[in-house]
Amino acid sequence: MAKTKDKNEWGSNLSFLLAMIGSAVGLGNIWRYPYVLYSNGGGAFFIPYIVAILIMGIPFLILEYGVGYNFKSSFPKAVKSISKKWEYLGWFLPVAVFMILIYYSAILGWDGFYVIISAFKGWGADPNAYFTGSFLQANDTLGGLGTFVPFVAIAMLVGWVIMWVISHTDLEKGLGRVSKVLVPLLFAIMIFIVLFSLTLPGAGIGLAELYNPDWSLLLNFNIWMAAFGQMIFSLSLGMSIAFTYASYTKDDSDLVSNALWVTVANCGFENFAAIGVFSILGYM
């Protein structure tokens, strides 16, 4: 399949690498993975987890890279170039990603607002009551789910504007530069949080509870499904993100080593985050 050249490409392999790490590392690593690890055998979970990395995570990421690199186009266009009558199937993934982005933008809006009020602990003595009552203004009725909260809407709007500006800027000057700043900053913040959490009283209790292995679960099919599911979710496999990013790589890009580094960074981050989460839970 001949490649269609696109002048808009990554300025360096580092930009591509950090952008891919930024797309992989996210809320699933911080919120989801610690729970999955704990509820699926603790330390025993690492066996199916490593197997999932080796036979699904790395190979499928390389596959997405290779296909995206070859077609040098969006996923719908790639499907169209194979068969025009199946082009509509190619739009399912971008639409799915957009739907995910909608609820992610809401969570990011919450996070942005909490960054501001964290300076003076604006949630008061009862954080749960503040979040559901004052912040979301939710109640037990069905109508309470649709309450319009102006400051949350503003926070979401700011997020959408930022994303629009970045996505409508030259790839290297926009997403490339942003990734070079925000991805290292994210890792630096997480390192600080985890190191601090390890100094808290009871941190060892939380870690012992997290990593206490239940070897009997290795015979349970569900733990293996959880490991492979986490790998798909964490690396965003099959969502056309890696496909799209790889379509903007230069001809001499080393896609295999990039896939290895992305997998190592992603899996390392979520395991590091799990240490911080359960250290804090042990303290609580």
Regions found by a protein language model. Give the residues of each.
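Membrane-embedded translocation segments of transport machinery
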Residues: A2-L14, G176, K180-M284
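Inter-helical loop and helix-membrane interface segments of multi-pass membrane transporters/permeases
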Residues: T4-N8, V36-N40, N70-F92, A106-E172, ...
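Transmembrane alpha-helical insertion/packing segments
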Residues: N13-M56, W215
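Hydrophobic alpha-helical transmembrane segments of multi-pass membrane proteins
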Residues: L18-A24, I50-I55, F92-Y103, V158-V165, ...
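Helical transmembrane-bundle signal
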Residues: G26, V97, Y104-I107, D111, ...
